[in-house]
Regions:
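Sequence-level detector for tyrosine residue identity
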Residues: 12, 27, 49, 78-81, ...
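Glycine-rich, aromatic-bearing surface loops/beta-hairpins
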Residues: 128-134
């Protein structure tokens, strides 16, 4: 079972669904797309891993490639939106985006990482609320 620990000062919850994580040491950074989809869709790690592997077979790429992730999210009925930022404005942060979207699942991308958001709460194995969404 995955570990969930709520931070009552924000809309962040610790979330680490990877069955190999033992509660100490380094986090597995390579599986962030899997964790993000697990959090947003309330699916277990192995199910999402298998979904991404199947998508990878269809696009002839690794399961965590951009094309594999895009196909997986499309199969899960997600719509891709780009963040539009006007000149002089800042990009939204993960925490602000989550607060402004209190209903529904979202998978968002920041520099080198992906995060799952569900009903206004963002789930990850580290506090990434300050990161800007791309």
């Amino acid at each position: 079972m995955h570990r969930v620990e709520q931070d009552v000062t924000s809309n962040y919850e610790f979330f680490q669904p990877n069955p190999s994580w033992k509660g100490k040491g380094k986090y597995l950074h390579e599986d962030c797309p899997i964790r993000a989809i697990c959090a947003a869709e309330h699916l277990d790690w192995n199910t999402v891993y298998d979904l991404l592997c199947d998508c990878g077979k269809h696009v002839f790429d690794a399961q965590t490639s951009d094309d594999s992730i895009a196909l997986c999210l499309k199969r899960l009925s997600y719509t891709k939106y780009s963040v539009k930022v006007t000149k002089g404005s800042k990009r939204p942060t993960v925490a602000n985006f989550a607060k402004e979207h209190p209903r529904g699942p979202y998978v968002v991308r920041v520099a080198g990482h992906m995060i799952g958001i569900k009903d206004g709460t963002y789930f990850d194995c580290w506090h990434c609320g300050h990161k800007c969404i791309y």
